[in-house]
């Protein structure tokens, strides 16, 4: 389910990126590493993200240094626990999702000899329909996020962002919640094995939520209250050949969410998530993806739950 936390961005596998080099301390950081980490992809539940495998646009072809990209995707999957409730109350469901994303990257801003500021703007719309509990769960979600990254030597990156997101129930048309969320992230990339790339990501964010509906099944929009969230994740990008047509992306993550306002004050949630995506670039601008994810949440206030999702996705992307 969408939440006040915006989708975290993950690195993109790009041409000749299968043998990534850490920038020596005597060299300037570049947009290349930041682009690897921030290209939009399909936002998946369980915080597993499908990266775009579109080769980067030649900077010389961009208008005055600006780079723009659009992406759209369809996903169909099965979930073992549609209401995110305790095991005895689990209910299975099929889910269909559609989304559209657009991103604008501004020209690099050099800061001294070794640092580069990387401003960007991201927008996303997502729709979901559920086989079960559709009147309660079908949603329309919108997100706009502005941010700036600081690319540093040796594949270190800092990120600062502010996003606004809003969720509506499709059946009733009513707003479920909206929120403002500032965030800070730290990322580090590593070249591993022969062609693979491993990324460590740590993120802290504060969500200020205006919730207009409260559901009896608390696991449905579990983090739709004012909260502070800290998360860490490891993501591995491994291509099966030098062209990158077939890529597997396993990921594990852990988040801690602390609620600080009524009616959720003093609530503390821990969410473990893991999963993998297998992406095949079958045409120049189109990807086919198979994915699965597992999530397990423990809380001192609401019911603990586990959920397993598996499905297929089709995405298309284009860069200007």
Regions from the PLM with identified roles:
Residues 1-71:
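N-terminal periplasmic/intermembrane-space "pro-region" immediately following the signal or transit peptide
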Residues 60-80, 118-121:
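Transmembrane beta-strand segments of Gram-negative outer membrane beta-barrel proteins
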Residues 70-72, 119-123, 146, 158-162, ...:
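Membrane-embedded beta-strand positions of outer-membrane beta-barrel proteins
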Residues 74-82, 104-106, 123-131, 162-170, ...:
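Transmembrane beta-strands of outer-membrane beta-barrel pores
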Residues 75-100, 132-134:
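Surface-exposed strand-loop-strand hairpins of Gram-negative outer-membrane beta-barrel proteins
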Residues 108-120, 153-160, 190-200, 241-248, ...:
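Repeated loop/turn-to-beta-strand initiation elements of outer-membrane beta-barrel proteins
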Residues 291, 306-320:
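Outer-membrane beta-barrel "beta-signal"
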């Amino acid at each position: 389910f969408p939440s006040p936390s915006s989708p975290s961005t993950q690195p993109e596998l790009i041409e000749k990126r299968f043998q990534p080099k850490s920038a020596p301390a005597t060299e300037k950081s570049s947009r290349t590493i930041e682009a690897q980490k921030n290209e939009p992809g399909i936002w998946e539940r369980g915080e597993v993200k499908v990266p775009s495998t579109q080769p980067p646009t030649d900077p010389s072809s961009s208008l005055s240094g600006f780079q723009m990209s659009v992406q759209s995707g369809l996903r169909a999957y099965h979930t073992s626990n549609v209401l995110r409730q305790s095991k005895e109350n689990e209910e299975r469901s099929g889910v269909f999702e559609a989304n559209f994303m657009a991103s604008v990257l501004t020209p690099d801003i050099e800061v001294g000899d070794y640092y580069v500021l990387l401003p960007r703007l991201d927008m996303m719309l997502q729709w979901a329909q559920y086989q079960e509990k559709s009147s309660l769960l079908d949603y329309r979600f919108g997100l706009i996020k502005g941010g700036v990254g600081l690319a540093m030597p040796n594949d270190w990156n800092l990120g600062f962002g502010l996003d606004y997101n809003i969720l509506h129930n499709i059946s009733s048309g009513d707003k479920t919640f909206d929120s403002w969320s500032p965030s800070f992230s730290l990322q580090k990339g590593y070249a591993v094995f022969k062609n693979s790339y491993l990324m460590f990501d740590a993120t802290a964010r504060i969500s200020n939520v205006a919730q207009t509906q409260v559901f009896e099944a608390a696991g449905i929009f579990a983090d739709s209250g004012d909260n502070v969230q800290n998360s860490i994740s490891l993501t591995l990008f491994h291509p099966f050949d030098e062209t990158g047509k077939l890529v597997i992306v396993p990921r594990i993550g852990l988040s801690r969410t602390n609620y600080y306002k009524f009616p959720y004050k003093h609530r503390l949630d821990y969410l473990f998530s893991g999963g993998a995506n297998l992406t095949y670039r079958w045409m120049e601008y189109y990807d086919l993806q198979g994915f699965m994810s597992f999530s397990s949440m423990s809380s001192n206030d609401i019911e603990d739950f586990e959920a397993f999702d598996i499905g297929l996705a089709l995405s298309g992307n284009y860069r200007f």
